[in-house]
């Protein structure tokens, strides 16, 4: 199995990937280092593919990875509607890509490296 270690042990790396994937689903765009973006892209593409499937097994598999965070809060009449990241994945993000076979994300390099260690920075966003 090939993957980037990113300088962390497995539990820290998995937690970082879960968090960044969840933030990508919620915000649809994140700024990070190039190495992290390439790893997050892999997990995000898998989650969107699960969202496109939409069956119970896919929902459970995605729920095991995507963090239970609030993605959107809005009012409908007298009620306040709260949408989680998982709900946004299955109801908003995945249907957008129903006719697309992969390639749901885009990595664009930023001109200025990170101050401090000069790490190459990129923007990872949903297409």
Curated annotation (Swiss-Prot):
Transmembrane segments: none
GO CC term (a single one): cytosolic large ribosomal subunit
Record key words, sorted: Ribonucleoprotein, Ribosomal protein
Record-linked Gene3D superfamilies: Ribosomal protein L17
GO biological process terms on file: translation
The organism's place on the tree of life at top rank: Bacteria
Entry GO MF terms: structural constituent of ribosome
Disulphide bonds in the chain: none
Pfam families in the record: Ribosomal_L17
Similarity comment: Belongs to the bacterial ribosomal protein bL17 family.
NCBIfam families, per the entry: L17
Subunit text: Part of the 50S ribosomal subunit. Contacts protein L32.
Protein name: Large ribosomal subunit protein bL17
């Amino acid at each position: 199995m090939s993957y980037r270690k990113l300088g962390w042990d497995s539990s820290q790396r998995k937690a970082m990937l879960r968090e960044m994937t969840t933030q990508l689903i919620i915000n649809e765009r994140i700024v990070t280092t190039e190495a992290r973006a390439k790893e997050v892209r892999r997990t995000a593409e898998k989650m969107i593919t699960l969202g496109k499937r939409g069956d119970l097994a896919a929902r459970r598999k995605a729920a095991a990875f995507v963090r239970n965070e609030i993605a959107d809060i809005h009012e409908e009449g007298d009620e306040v509607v709260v949408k989680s990241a998982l709900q946004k994945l299955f109801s908003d993000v995945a249907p957008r890509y129903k006719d697309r076979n992969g390639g749901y994300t885009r990595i664009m390099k930023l001109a200025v490296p990170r101050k401090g260690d000069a790490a190459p920075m990129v923007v990872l966003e949903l297409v």
